[in-house]
Amino acid sequence: GVSTLAKLLNPKIKVIGVEPAGANCMQESLKTGEVVTLPQVNTIADGTAVKTPGSKIFPYIQENLDDIITVHDDELIVAFLDMVENHKMIVENSGLLTVAALKHLSVKDKRVVSILSGGNMDVITMSSVVQKGLILRDRIFTVSIQLPDKPGELCRVAGVVASVQANVIKLDHN
């Protein structure tokens, strides 16, 4: 629907579709020229995790789409973190496909519209996505060390952590 309206308003506009790499049924369908069913899908973008594209919309997509690209789940995770931290917006993973796709496109000095949609994400999923995003950005990591069992050793490690302006988020001591 969006591609049809965009082309109707401006026939010269370039419309680029985006799918998760783990659920790229439309991309595969466009390659073959007919609706393709994937054997399986694997993506965190659950709102677009379909094996088969809609047969009724397929002809419109063929007619109006200039290109289609895929993005990986890690890119969606980083896009989520960017939206939360930089724009104070919560957008579900499927709704972030266009944001993640921008990293693949040459958009400097161009007018670009990136459609964001949906905020249907429970707090457990949100927490997991934020955690993974921080790991992907090398902002948190796990360190496992073995210390002698004597007083002051943990304090010594804490001193090293503090000396590099870092924080301990969680500590497991066995």
What are these regions (language model features)?
Residues 126-174:
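A conserved regulatory-domain signal marking ACT and ACT-like small-molecule sensing domains
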Residues 41-44, 50-63, 132-147:
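Active-site pocket-lining segment
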Residues 38, 58, 107-110, 115, ...:
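Active-site loop ensemble at the mouth of alpha/beta enzyme cores that anchors a bound cofactor
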Residues 54-110:
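Active-site-adjacent helical/loop segments in soluble small-molecule enzymes
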Residues 1-3, 23-27, 94-102, 115, ...:
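Short glycine/serine/threonine-rich phosphate/pyrophosphate-binding segments
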Residues 8-23:
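Short, acidic/small-residue loops that bind anionic groups at enzyme active sites
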Residues 6, 26-44, 48, 132:
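Anionic-ligand binding region
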